[in-house]
Amino acid sequence: MVQVNSNYLKLKAGYLFPEISRRVNAFCELNPTASLIRLGIGDVTEPLPQACCKAMKTAIEEMGSTSGFRGYGPEQGYLWLREAIAKNDFQSRGCQISADEIFVSDGSKCDSSNILDILGTGNKIAVTDPVYPVYVDSNVMAGQTGIAASSGHYEGLVYIPLNAENGFEAELPSEPVDLIYLCFPNNPTGAVASKVQLTKWVEYAKKNHALILFDAAYESFIQDPLLPHSIFEIDGATDCAIEFRSFSKNAGFTGTRCAFTVIPKSLKGKTLDGAEVDFWSLWNRRQSTKFNGVSYIVQRGAEAVYSLEGQSQTNKLVSFYMKNAEIIRKQLTLAGYKIYGGKHAPYVWLEAPTEMDSWQFFDHLLNKANIVGTPGSGFGVAGEGYFRLSAFNSRSNVEEAMRRITSI
């Protein structure tokens, strides 16, 4: 009989969001007339920017003609999109990133998992706690961890707590690590990192010959012009970091699928015998072998994000969701909840009532207010006692959700 990847059996029962769906479905079966408001999973609700729609319509018409038809595109993405990304997202902020260091993909979730394909085994890995579950689960699947201990932590991982006591600032590990996952603005806490904080991480990574995997999926929600949007705004980061970005949240591409990963050509790792190898070549080989690229139509839609019309429309989308976050923060603060995040990210992180754990508060909101949120414990041990609410919904739903929560 064929053998399975037994590392999957080490995963804790139920990925966070499927477990939420299971509980919600069970509730709906018992309460078919209930009007649920979903502020849980970070999926957008507003329509795509019209600039993107127009560009994709034009691309569809091109594909329907003999002269405009395109088959397989470059696995790394079309050059015109990569050039637009490099110019607008990096070079405009002083980052020395070129178009050929950008790899277009169908999602940063995929990239942050698939990057393990080019990393060796035995690396010491650091993650924040709480953390986006994909970082941990993908390492478990790849055999990079031991089993989950009774504490809830996986053996072999170094956990960096993010909590109210440390101001949700990721502190440097007390021991050398090889691989570091950072996400700022942070999912789930909504915390943001300053240039000073990121500089400490870059200096640590260079000193310890470590690699930073930097998830900047929510950078467009940063409101303070002094805060960095990219790890590459920090001197030396091109020698120690890979960055993941996405069009999912700023342009509403969660169902359209387009993202990109930035791998500087100067970034190097080593083989078991100590020889240096650049990560760019490894990732390029990986993508050429396992990925056929994002569709031409979708890439034209992504390119339109950088047009004047596209920039105006995506800025309005971001402002809309951040206004929702402001409403959530204000109303829950008035109701006596302790609130964090929501200022530079579309997520509000709050403390559950003292008599409830995270899942009890989830069930409380579901049953008493018909509101779906995300229990903090689903993001890690340090998330216990916290709860995440997403600003991704209509204005009327957010206002109604706040009315319901504050009245129970």
From Swiss-Prot:
The keyword Membrane does not apply. Its cofactor is pyridoxal 5'-phosphate. Homodimer. Gene3D superfamilies: Aspartate Aminotransferase, domain 1 (3.90.1150.10), Type I PLP-dependent aspartate aminotransferase-like (Major domain) (3.40.640.10). Pathway: Amino-acid biosynthesis; L-lysine biosynthesis via DAP pathway; LL-2,6-diaminopimelate from (S)-tetrahydrodipicolinate (aminotransferase route): step 1/1. It is an enzyme of class 2 (transferase). Pyridoxal 5'-phosphate binds at Y72, S108, K109, Y132, N187, Y218, S246, F247, S248, R257, N292. This is LL-diaminopimelate aminotransferase.
